[in-house]
Amino acid sequence: MEMSLLSIVLLGIVEGVTEFLPVSSTGHLILAGEVMKVPQGTETFDIVIQLGAILAVVVLYRERFAAVLAGLGRRDPAAIRFTRNVLVGFLPSAVIGAVAYGAIKAMLNTPIIVAVALILGGIAILVIERLVRSPTCDSVEGMSLRTSFGVGLVQCLSMIPGVSRSGATIMGALTLGVERRTAAEYSFFLAIPTMLGATTLALWKARHELGDAQATAIAIGFVVSFIVAMLVIRWFLGVVTRHGFAPFAWYRIIAGTAALIWLLAR
């Protein structure tokens, strides 16, 4: 993996902007890599820099996480429910990812698949936004085991590049009666164990291949994605509260269509 500094920074920005938006960070990294002609073999880079964006969640919600940890020490029911719901939501992707992720990636990790998934995902968001009414849950602590597990199952769809992990989990949560902002925040929290697991696995598999240049590229991309994600998360919650998810659906459809035309015409 040999990338220019400009490519590393741009990919870090793409990751930081798209990780928590329902637009597929992995899909955008694949398409951006195609446009910038990034060399093959950057999969570990793409996965590990996502952890930079995840760290932004930990920092922004540090007081809430500290309260949960303190509550667990006191056996506080709300803290226990919060932790339980995040872990239950993580379980399906941990199991299915360990078994099937490699095969799915080998078959579907192409720019064409990303473009089609962006379009179909955008249409799905518009449909769900129209159908969902009257949420019954307005907190992560208030989610049932069934809801948490259901969102976790839907998250497995995001193993298909272009689907979007945040998009799948947020739409799954909305469909199961979770309020918009809570659905977005649950998606943020669910990303922590999910991406920690994916990053650990990626680093373990690449442990004999990472040299100084690769490690430096990953470190730069990590820092850039962290800084950008810090700025994007609060903006995203404000947009969702005021306008819902339709703006992101239309973006997906337009971006996916443009990418598909470009890929087929070149």
Swiss-Prot record:
Localization per Swiss-Prot or TrEMBL: Cell inner membrane
Highest taxon in the source lineage: Bacteria
Keyword Transmembrane helix: yes
Primary site of residence: membrane
Alphabetic keyword roster: Antibiotic resistance, Cell inner membrane, Cell membrane, Cell shape, Cell wall biogenesis/degradation, Hydrolase, Membrane, Peptidoglycan synthesis, Transmembrane, Transmembrane helix
Annotated Gene Ontology cellular component terms: plasma membrane
BP terms from Gene Ontology: cell wall organization; peptidoglycan biosynthetic process; regulation of cell shape; response to antibiotic
Function per UniProt: Catalyzes the dephosphorylation of undecaprenyl diphosphate (UPP). Confers resistance to bacitracin.
This protein's name: Undecaprenyl-diphosphatase
Organism: Rhizorhabdus wittichii (strain DSM 6014 / CCUG 31198 / JCM 15750 / NBRC 105917 / EY 4224 / RW1) (Sphingomonas wittichii)
